Amino acid sequence: MNVSHRRYHIITFGCQMNKADSERMAGILENLGMTYTDDPNQADLVLYNTCSIRDNAEQKVYSYLGRQAKRKQVEPELTLVVAGCVAQQEGEQLLRRVPELDLVMGPQHANRLDQLLEQVWAGSQVVATESLHIMEDITKPRRESTVSAWVNIIYGCNERCSYCVVPNVRGVEQSRTPEAIYGEMEVLAQQGFKEVTLLGQNIDAYGRDLPGTTPSGRHLHTLTDLLYHVHDIEGIDRLRFATSHPRYFTERLIQACQELPKVCEHFHIPFQSGDNDILKAMKRGYTREKYLQIIEKIRRYMPDAAISADVIVGFPGETEAQFENTLNLIEEVGFDLLNTAAYSPRPGTPAAFWDNQLSEEVKGDRLQRLNHLVSTQAMERSQRYLGRVEEVLVEGENLKSPGQVMGRTRGNRLTFFQGEISELLGKTVPVKITEARAFSLTGEALSLVTA
């Protein structure tokens, strides 16, 4: 089928992994000759890349999908695709619920989108959710940014947290080879990208499935080794990585982050709960004390590092005292940013079937109290930037304030200052911070271009 001059639209829900997958699928569609439109109602192909981590994200997908399903009833040539975790979780049930769908595909099939669409355009309704080895993608992604890029280094998850659906929908861990990662990053450097964020569901588990061990018995390939391997790629000025699991986070990794100047001083390490009994019920594989030891080591090597995390309140059986333990941990650590959520039962997870579920009223109250503490702490942490000069990598314009550009500090703080985007995009600028809010900064450029 000739699809040149046809338009596509992708709507992405959920995590950074999904955003990276969407960029790759967009690249595949453009390689087929399609062009992007920001209006889904003008698109010939609409793709929803979905998230099932929480029920509200899943329900939002069905709301969006219903509108396009009605459109397809009068425009049968429209191609409707659901990708990602909801697709993997629901499979053929999605077709029964939304018979207008043409393609249902799990995240392991993102790199096969063109092959699956060939089947669709030949007249088939396709469901692709079987587990398989993730193909190394040779298609150029359509990156949303021209400055910062995602690079997947490990897919899947081998953990079995009692509340989490991710292992069921993203499959087992599959690490890419260091050579493949290095090659992709070299291309990014040649294209002018300045910052790369290495991605993985549990990124510090990277390499456990790759062959080889060192004489001391550790895995031959680790995230630490990979950082050293890619650090000197010319043109890439900044390196980040996410998301880290406390079980695999090592002092050796922290030391590497201190030693390697391109690695930014920002760590995202979810703790989920500050109570040991809840952590055990969650099957997280570490204790409160273990988590605090990690934070202490980070502070020892990199005192000013920014630390962010994920936390869940209202887990089945959580008492008020156990919730207070979570609040106490937050106060003890001093996080720069926390992604917060009330527990949401997910299909096929053990915790969803327990009979000690908390009421929505209790979960909502605890989430509100948690968010108040998070905002207060973020504001307090922001104050340390006042009067300091921070290196800001310019990523774009501040669309709400003409004449301002926006970028991020090495600690991942969104920062605004006056400047011309045509001159500054992709440049690192020293900015003196004059205003600090809970989750962003404003400053004045001391020099318009340093790199």
UniProtKB/Swiss-Prot annotation:
Supply one GO BP term. tRNA methylthiolation
Q: Which GO cellular component terms, listed alphabetically, does the Swiss-Prot or TrEMBL entry include?
A: cytoplasm
Q: Kindly give the SMART domains that the UniProt entry links to this protein.
A: Elp3
The residues covered by the Radical SAM core domain are 143-384
Q: Which cofactor does it need?
A: [4Fe-4S] cluster
Which part of the chain is the MTTase N-terminal domain? 6-122
Q: Which residues cross the membrane?
A: none
Cell compartments where the protein resides = Cytoplasm
Keyword Disulfide bond on entry: no
Keyword Membrane recorded: no
Q: Which residues does the annotation say bind [4Fe-4S] cluster 2?
A: C157, C161, C164
Record-linked Gene3D superfamilies:
Methylthiotransferase, N-terminal domain, tm_1862 like domain
The TRAM domain, residue ranges? 383-447
Q: Which sites bind [4Fe-4S] cluster 1? A: C15, C51, C85
Function in brief: Catalyzes the methylthiolation of N6-(dimethylallyl)adenosine (i(6)A), leading to the formation of 2-methylthio-N6-(dimethylallyl)adenosine (ms(2)i(6)A) at position 37 in tRNAs that read codons beginning with uridine.
What protein name applies here?
tRNA-2-methylthio-N(6)-dimethylallyladenosine synthase
Instruction: State the organism of origin.
Output: Synechocystis sp. (strain ATCC 27184 / PCC 6803 / Kazusa)
User: What are the top taxonomic ranks of the organism?
Assistant: Bacteria, Bacillati, Cyanobacteriota, Cyanophyceae, Synechococcales
